[in-house]
Amino acid sequence: MPSFDIVSEVNLVEVKNALDQSNKEITNRYDFKGSDARVELADKIMTAYADSDFQLDQVKDVLLGKLAKRDVDVRCLDYAKVEKVSGNKVKQAITVKVGVETDLAKKLVRLIKDSKLKVQASIQGDAVRVSGAKRDVLQETIAMVRKEITDFPLQFNNFRE
């Protein structure tokens, strides 16, 4: 029985490379001279530091540009609230979301079941496994999911006959 997995994966090596490039650009830019603007990575959480809210937005713009150039989908980023640090400085945590969260997985399963296509969807950890009798029906399912879910980056892999 043919099947495939719906997953959400992010290449963390590319995220680290984009972060390094961002820090290099921030240290060399004239408008950041003498400031404490930087981006740090710890596990899957990036933290952007700056002297003001305006500079923080500039740091995030640089980071998003570098991530986009390295083919990292920026829809997988989750922004926390901006926090005041000592003095006038601000910081913001940016989480890289990896894997299909349970509420999104339930939404995917419900969407697939409501579509009346002859496929079965099941949640397996941080992925959704979809299996069906025919390959054509699975391809229709992929097209339908791509059309319906646009706010979160999804990949379709492990396609088996």
Curated annotation (Swiss-Prot):
UniProt key word Chaperone: no
InterPro entries given in the database record: DUF520, UPF0234-like_C, UPF0234_N, YajQ-like_sf
One GO MF term attached to the UniProt entry: nucleotide binding
UniProt entry keywords in alphabetical sequence: Nucleotide-binding
Entry superkingdom: Bacteria
Any GO CC annotation of this UniProt entry: cytosol
Coiled-coil regions listed in the entry: none
Pfam families, sorted: DUF520
Role, per record: Nucleotide-binding protein.
Record PANTHER family: UPF0234 PROTEIN YAJQ
Family under the similarity heading: Belongs to the YajQ family.
Family annotation (NCBIfam families): PRK05412.1 (NF003819)
Name of this protein: Nucleotide-binding protein LHK_01423
Lineage: Bacteria, Pseudomonadati, Pseudomonadota, Betaproteobacteria, Neisseriales
